[in-house]
Amino acid sequence: MQNNTLSRADLSNETGIAKNVHYGDVLIKFGDVLDVSREQLPMIKDEKILDKYKASFLQNGDVIIADTAEDTTVGKCSEIAGLRDEVVLSGLHTIPYRPVEKFATGYLGYYLNSSAFHKQLIPLMQGIKVTSISKSAMQDTDIIYTKSLEEQGKIGNFFQFIDHLIT
């Protein structure tokens, strides 16, 4: 999967033909699970962009990782949920992933943002003023999970419940 390289200036907050997940929003605005039906996302204005990234249209369960930050929040991610008919693309300074195996909604979003997983990313980060992580470095990480979709669902629902209590 591919991300686009559109800056904020190339996007619109009002109208467009596709939604765009920007790394700054992943780092600050969005939680572990991004319900695209509830969040207002910046819009892509240029229709030619869609043809170039057609194979990378996001789906429910995809994960968007912010690959750049000014600190060790690099690697924060949002799992895509609530997607219906909209076209959504992964934006500048993000790495989109589509799981090969089926996961329960929310499980990957919460797990990949856990300290247990993030500890693997810290030695892979590069940079001094601006920190980043590469796709190739991400391949050196391990995802630990139960094969039971029911158990994954319970874990995801538990953390979602806690999120709602806090907010």
PLM regions and their residue ranges:
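Non-catalytic DNA-recognition/assembly elements of restriction-modification systems
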Residues: 1-11, 15-19, 149
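Generic structural signal for secondary-structure transition and capping sites
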Residues: 2-6, 117, 164
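Specificity-determining recognition surfaces
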Residues: 11, 32, 76, 91, ...
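Short beta-strand/loop turn elements enriched in aromatics
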Residues: 15-36
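A short beta-sheet element
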Residues: 22-26, 39-113
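A generic structural signal for alpha-helix starts
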Residues: 103, 116, 147-150
